Regions:
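N-terminal single-pass transmembrane signal-anchor helix
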Residues: 4-39, 49
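Surface-exposed loop/linker segments characteristic of extracytoplasmic
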Residues: 22, 37-295
Length: 295
């Protein structure tokens, strides 16, 4: 008597393949979540390092570095050059020439240097930019995923989206410096540095805009952001977080972006944050009332 060996039917085989596919998908999703969690933590540490360096600079100089210098009176320099020594980059700082513009050929070996602590691991690594700013004559600089914030744009006030603050200025300004004593809104309620990742490619809502590049990406240029999305609004208020990286707070982290506060802490600002709250966090002495639970 012959015993027939039971074989898989086609349907059973397809079911097994489908189950394996689902398991692989779940595994890949879990791996991606773990990787992103690690990236976000590394990004947080980068901003903590930047915040500490800025506070050390302040301790020595009794003020923060300017946002940029030389706009109207060259030579032209960005913000990061001022505190490179406090980021354990003394050798790089020593080779930087202050008597010429950052984009001068003599400074190219310095400003084209890729600095890991200025790159969020969730973004594409080792980007550089032939800067589109007409001031810099197309010179190349290594890009940064972080920037200081300059001010609340006047257009937000004029449009009625935010109330007129006592001052629209943030901590970093053109050709001038601020002190901790100037941050009367409170250091825990004022943003010092923030993510603006992915430059020079223009990104909107997690997608690259084909053929569109933006200026301001190199860490050595006037790498300041506004803290609001000027080129994309979401009624009834303009978009605040992760809407565009055109000089606005933008990251590749799901659900929000990291910012370094003036007290040295790092906060994760969530997508959907009220633009009025963000504006209050941008100003250093706007006299707005903000509580920690608001953000």
């Amino acid at each position: 008597m012959h015993h027939l060996r039971k074989a898989f039917t086609l349907i059973e085989l397809l079911v097994v393949i489908a189950i394996i596919g689902v398991l692989i998908g779940l595994l890949l999703s879990a791996v991606q979540k773990v990787r992103e969690s690690a990236n976000r933590m590394a990004c947080t540490n980068n901003l903590k390092q930047i915040g500490l360096a800025l506070h050390n600079y302040h301790d020595v100089n009794q003020k923060f570095p300017p946002g940029t210098v030389g706009i109207n009176n060259p030579p032209f320099h960005g913000n990061v050059q001022f505190f490179l020594p406090y980021l354990e980059q003394q050798t790089l700082a020593t080779h930087y020439r202050w008597e010429v513009d950052w984009f001068h050929r003599d400074n190219q070996p310095v400003v084209s240097r890729q600095l890991k602590f200025l790159q969020c691991p969730s973004a594409e690594p080792n980007r550089e930019q032939k800067d589109l700013d007409p001031m810099v004559d197309g010179k190349v600089g290594a890009c940064s995923d972080y920037a200081g914030i300059r001010e609340v744009p006047q257009e937000l006030v004029e449009s009625g989206w935010v109330s007129q603050p006592a001052t629209r200025d943030s901590i970093f300004m053109m050709d001038s410096s601020s002190r901790i004593a100037d941050i009367t809104d409170g250091t825990s309620n004022t943003i010092l540095y923030a993510e603006d990742a992915g430059r020079p490619q223009l990104w909107r809502d997690g997608r690259p805009v084909p053929g569109e590049l933006i200026s301001g990406g190199p860490w050595a240029t006037r790498n300041l952001i506004w803290g609001t999305a000027s080129d994309r609004g979401t009624p009834p208020w303009p978009c605040a977080i992760n809407c565009s990286n055109n000089r606005e707070i933008y990251s590749f982290h799901p659900g929000g972006a990291n910012v370094a506060m003036a007290d040295g802490s790092v906060r994760f600002l969530k997508v959907g944050l009220d633009i009025r709250i963000l504006a209050a966090l941008v100003t250093r002495a706007g006299r707005e009332v903000v509580s920690e639970s608001d953000f």
